[in-house]
């Protein structure tokens, strides 16, 4: 955890200690880096009653999320199995962005205003997103950096 964040966290935890147990106040604490939290910070009675870990969606969950985000958008689903296979380890927001970009590809090639996402639109959007994701990973890891 960044050293500058400790005072803020300690202050928040101290304020929580001052609340009466019967107060109608619920705190939801979230982090994507639970590994950085010191267990003793949250271990005091009354601070954290329950911890819930949210994992990345499995194939069935990705299909359900895909259907949810697609809504009533007309789409050729013939390549969906390949998309689901290639999206192992992605978040729900990735899938939402995938559908948004596929719709943009469809809109770019449509003159009559009827939006119909093809399997090629979906594949192109997925390729673009995965390329962006891989480029970001290479940048973060310094791949190709001679120094």
Residue map of PLM features:
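C-terminal alpha-helical "lid" subdomain
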Residues: 59-147
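Walker A/P-loop NTP-binding motif of AAA+ ATPase domains
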Residues: 1-81
């Amino acid at each position: 955890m960044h050293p500058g964040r400790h005072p803020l966290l300690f202050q928040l935890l101290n304020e929580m200690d001052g609340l009466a147990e019967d107060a109608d106040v619920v705190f939801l604490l979230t982090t994507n880096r639970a590994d950085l939290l010191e267990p003793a910070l949250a271990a005091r009675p009354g601070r954290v009653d329950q911890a819930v870990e949210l994992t990345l969606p499995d194939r069935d969950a990705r299909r359900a999320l895909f259907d949810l985000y697609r809504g009533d958008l007309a789409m050729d689903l013939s390549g969906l199995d390949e998309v689901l296979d290639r999206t192992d380890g992605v978040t729900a927001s990735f899938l939402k962005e995938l559908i948004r970009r596929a719709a943009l590809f469809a809109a770019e090639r449509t003159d009559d205003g009827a939006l119909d996402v093809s399997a090629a639109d979906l594949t192109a959007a997925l390729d673009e997103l995965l390329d962006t994701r891989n480029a970001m990973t290479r940048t973060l890891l310094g791949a190709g950096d001679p120094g």
